[in-house]
């Protein structure tokens, strides 16, 4: 009951996180990974590792396959939260394995240990490529995995090349800056909740501000991208952000993750609805029942009928213009 009350209070206190509707489409944007002329020379004659997942694509081809086909000496794949294939639950332990197509070892940073690479793994490569699609939230963990790898690369004298991608929530900044006494695995830098930065910008800022150890860092930027560019993701960044609408709603909806309310995990509308069994039927006509699904094996309130609010029909343009 106390958590349900907290949810109600948060609903009243939550500021409207409205963004100026970005102009332009994503058609003209070229992601860093596609600019091979900018980074292939940095890989020549060197052992290469990648920090990558299912979003690391160049057109219809995965970055790992592109590197392998191009004769790059690929010696390791490091995988972040949700695993290399992006199917694991939030925070789920994922065992290391081998990429079937290339035979390259996949070293999971979420294997239940330190979430950092081993000394053995660090000795297996000379340069690290980072290519993952972020969504622009402080508690979204891909940038934290990148920072941990950057620190290890600084310790071992390894070069880091970040292949940048647009931030789909990059047109605005909102929320408080993290008090670093609360630094954790879901918040690693003194930045706002909605920080507006790309992965490459985070990497540069972290080194420049002294938040990360100095390392040999190169960022390959996106072409024809600004923070006013509306960019629709071609691949879901994680199992419970399957649509562009869920990505736009995530900054507001995820704030209630610590309450008793279901946020749609275990439904076909994750982060596009919310509810609880005790929400009154006379005020909340929408009902749903969380069930085990890929990426949500044991969702909150599993098997219980919840009443709440359905946001799955809310137009993306309205979310961008007015917030939630």
Language-model features, listed with the residues they occupy:
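Bacterial N-terminal signal peptides
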Residues: 7-15
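N-terminal phosphate-binding or glycine-rich loops at protein starts, especially the Walker A/P-loop
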Residues: 26-72
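Short internal beta-strands
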Residues: 75-82, 163
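Glycine-rich, charge-decorated loop segments at or immediately adjacent to ligand/cofactor-binding or catalytic sites
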Residues: 86-91, 161-183
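Glycine-rich oxoanion-binding loops at beta->alpha junctions
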Residues: 94-125, 137
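Glycine/threonine-rich flexible loop motifs
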Residues: 134-146
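Conserved anion/nucleotide-ligand pocket segment
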Residues: 183-253
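Conserved functional hotspot residues or short segments at active or partner-binding sites
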Residues: 270, 275-324
């Amino acid at each position: 009951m106390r958590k349900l009350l907290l949810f109600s209070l948060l609903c009243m206190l939550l500021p409207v996180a409205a963004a100026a509707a970005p102009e332009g489409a994503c058609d003209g944007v070229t992601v860093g990974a596609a600019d091979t002329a900018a980074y292939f020379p940095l890989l020549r004659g060197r052992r290469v590792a990648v920090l990558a997942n299912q979003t690391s694509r160049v057109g219809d081809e995965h970055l790992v396959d592109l590197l392998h086909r191009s004769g790059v000496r690929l010696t390791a794949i490091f995988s972040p939260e949700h695993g290399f294939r992006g199917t694991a639950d939030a925070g789920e332990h994922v065992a290391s394995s081998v990429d079937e197509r290339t035979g390259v070892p996949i070293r999971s940073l979420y294997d239940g240990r330190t979430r950092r690479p081993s000394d053995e793994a660090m000795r297996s490569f000379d340069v690290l490529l980072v290519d993952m699609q972020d969504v622009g939230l402080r508690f979204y963990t891909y940038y934290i995995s990148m920072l941990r790898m950057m620190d290890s690369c600084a310790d071992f004298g390894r070069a880091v090349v970040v292949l940048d991608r647009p931030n789909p929530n990059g047109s605005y900044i909102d929320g408080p800056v993290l008090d670093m006494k609360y630094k954790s695995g879901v918040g690693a830098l003194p930045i706002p909740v909605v920080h507006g930065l790309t992965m490459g910008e985070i990497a540069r800022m972290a080194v420049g501000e002294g938040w990360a150890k100095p390392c040999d860092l190169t960022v390959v930027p996106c072409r024809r991208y600004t923070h006013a560019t509306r960019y629709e993701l071609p691949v879901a960044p994680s199992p419970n952000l399957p649509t562009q609408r869920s990505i736009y709603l995530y900054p507001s909806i995820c704030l209630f993750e610590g309450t008793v309310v279901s946020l749609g995990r275990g439904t076909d509308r994750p982060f596009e609805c919310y509810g609880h069994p005790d929400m009154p039927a006379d005020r909340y006509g929408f009902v749903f029942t969380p069930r085990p699904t890929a990426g949500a094996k044991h969702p909150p309130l599993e098997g219980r009928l919840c009443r709440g609010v359905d946001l799955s029909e809310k137009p993306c343009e309205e979310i961008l213009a007015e917030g939630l």
